[in-house]
């Protein structure tokens, strides 16, 4: 049923729970696990810093990419150690649009996303809700 499972992964506790669930799902199905991490734009104050020192923005972005690549490598190792075939991709853009584009491009059969347990007040504006509104594949929300 599910041949390609994609998990949205970042530095959050919720993403760690989503990764664990995605690994558990992928293993018995022998599904390919794709770990996607979105590289979002830097905060606006970097634009001001760029006026004074243009390399500052590029250096900060590269440091962010490097940190996220290291995070992904750790996730791939964790999946591989569990016997799951896994790859990782970094995508640029907004959180929602990046996840949706990656799921379409990689032909994901299932998308797994973590969601805070105590995040009910703004649930209608959550990343999970917005991704659900824009993706064509089934979505599993992990608390």
Question: What are these regions, as identified by a protein language model?
Answer:
Residues 137-143:
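Short, flexible loop segments at boundaries between secondary-structure elements
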Residues 42-43, 96-98, 120:
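Generic structural signal for helix capping and beta-alpha/helix-loop junctions
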Residues 54-70:
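A short acidic, glycine-rich active-site loop
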């Amino acid at each position: 049923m599910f041949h390609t499972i994609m998990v949205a992964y970042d530095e959050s506790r919720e993403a760690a729970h989503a990764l664990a669930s995605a690994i558990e799902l992928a293993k018995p199905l022998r599904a390919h696990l794709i770990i996607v991490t979105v590289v979002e734009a830097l905060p606006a104050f970097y634009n001001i810093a760029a006026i004074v020192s243009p390399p500052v923005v590029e250096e900060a972005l590269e440091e962010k990419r490097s940190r996220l690549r290291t995070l992904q490598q750790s996730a791939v190792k964790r999946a591989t150690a569990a016997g799951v075939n896994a790859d990782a991709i970094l995508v640029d853009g907004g959180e929602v649009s990046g996840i949706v584009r990656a799921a379409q491009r990689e032909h994901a059969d299932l998308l797994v996303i973590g969601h805070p347990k105590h995040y009910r007040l703004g649930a209608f504006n959550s990343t999970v809700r917005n991704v659900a509104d824009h993706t064509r594949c089934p979505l599993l929300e992990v608390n």
